[in-house]
Swiss-Prot record:
One of its GO terms (molecular function) is rRNA binding. NCBIfam families: PRK05327.1 (NF003717), rpsD_bact (TIGR01017). One of its GO terms (biological process) is ribosomal small subunit biogenesis. Part of the 30S ribosomal subunit. Contacts protein S5. The interaction surface between S4 and S5 is involved in control of translational fidelity. This is Small ribosomal subunit protein uS4. Belongs to the universal ribosomal protein uS4 family. Pfam families: Ribosomal_S4 (PF00163), S4 (PF01479). It comes from Dictyoglomus turgidum (strain DSM 6724 / Z-1310). GO terms for cellular component: small ribosomal subunit. One of the primary rRNA binding proteins, it binds directly to 16S rRNA where it nucleates assembly of the body of the 30S subunit.
Amino acid sequence: MARYTGPDCRLCRREGMKLFLKGTKCFSEKCPFERRPFPPGQHGRAQRKLTEYGLRLREKQRAKRIYGVLERQFRRYFEIASKGRGVTGERLLQLLETRLDNVVYRLGWALSRAQARQIVSHGKIAVNGKRVNIPSYNLKPGDVVELLDKDLIPVQEAISVFGNKSVPAWLELDRENLRGKVLRLPKREEIDTPVQEQLIVEFYSR
């Protein structure tokens, strides 16, 4: 399966904001974005005014990079969202938020979505009692997510960093047994991802 293998910090610089792709490094002085908060490349510092198309493209790219999704899969999410009930942009974000890797991240079991993706891929997560190793697996209200290896070092590190940080209202977390539950689909105001989803809708609807 295709995936991005370049430097994650380069993506943050390209989008002009921290995407928090590298866990604790993003909060430290070692974060390259702190030292070079401008796009990579020879002309990175140059001020360029984006066209309407450019603005929509950047918003789409930002969302893809935050959730770690490549173009083909992202477009498929949009097509599903556009055919479903409700507001297309909000539905798109709901599909991205209910990915298994994102829920593992939201529950505080990983320092980044990339780390959560690895935990899922290695078969450390069960959904409704069955092992699932597909990061893109979409969860539904009522689904129960459980960590199979509760002593996994990356998970323990994430728990120590996040502490008792509250989880989103649409999720329920049993901290003692490391078990989570999807209570319902998230509302738009409960999704803190810094994207303007309407621009993404306009990009694909052009």
